[in-house]
Amino acid sequence: MRKIILASGSPRRKELLELADVPFEIVVSEVEETIGAYSSPSDIVMSLALQKASAVAENHSNQVVLGADTIVTYDSRILGKPSNEAEAKEMLRLLSGKTHEVYTGVAIISKEKTVTFYERTEVTFWGLTEEEIDVYVASKEPLDKAGSYGIQGKGSIFVQHIQGDYYSVVGLPIARLVRELKQFDSDVTHA
């Protein structure tokens, strides 16, 4: 597999690509993410992933560009990254003792084709105490994560059950992504 461009500065996405031995370089997308009138969370994450990948692909037309976006939903409410500690605590209270959905959308763009897909994973939290929430938010870990938790970090102790792709919750459905990238291998030029 030849080198792709990851249109993201996410350390988690970087780690997952490294884990799968996918050669890549990072070019962070500076696009202003806009959510239009979409019918579903899956449409939202695929659109945002496509916006990110398209913005980077404009200047890298001979490469394969990968964009991704993750959101958490509960009871038809979209939970993105919290804007502050109070919002992080509010999100964690909302998710406490309940099942929510995590959607990760992926867009892969080359000169020849564009592929978008998403994965949906259900995550159930144990009931959380106010002290657990306060200590976790004070760690700062949840402040840059959709839904205010990192399943691969300290937030892992909140997870009672998961149904679906764990790595999608982390930030990339890596097994499916590697399979999808195979159809682009001939489209990738050497860096």
UniProtKB/Swiss-Prot annotation:
Site (Important for substrate specificity): R12, T70, Q152
Transmembrane segments: none
Single GO biological process annotation from the record: nucleotide metabolic process
EC number(s) from the headed UniProt entry: 3.6.1.9
Any single GO CC term annotated in Swiss-Prot or TrEMBL for this entry: cytoplasm
Subcellular location: Cytoplasm
Active-site residue list: D69 (proton acceptor)
Class of the enzyme per the UniProt entry, highest EC level: hydrolase
Cofactor: a divalent metal cation
Pfam name, any one: Maf
UniProt key word Hydrolase: yes
Single annotated GO MF: UTP diphosphatase activity
Keywords: Cytoplasm, Hydrolase, Nucleotide metabolism
Catalytic reaction(s) noted: dTTP + H2O = dTMP + diphosphate + H(+); UTP + H2O = UMP + diphosphate + H(+)
UniProt similarity note: Belongs to the Maf family. YhdE subfamily.
Role, per record: Nucleoside triphosphate pyrophosphatase that hydrolyzes dTTP and UTP. May have a dual role in cell division arrest and in preventing the incorporation of modified nucleotides into cellular nucleic acids.
NCBIfam families attached to this UniProt entry: maf
Name under which the protein is recorded: dTTP/UTP pyrophosphatase
Native organism: Bacillus mycoides (strain KBAB4)
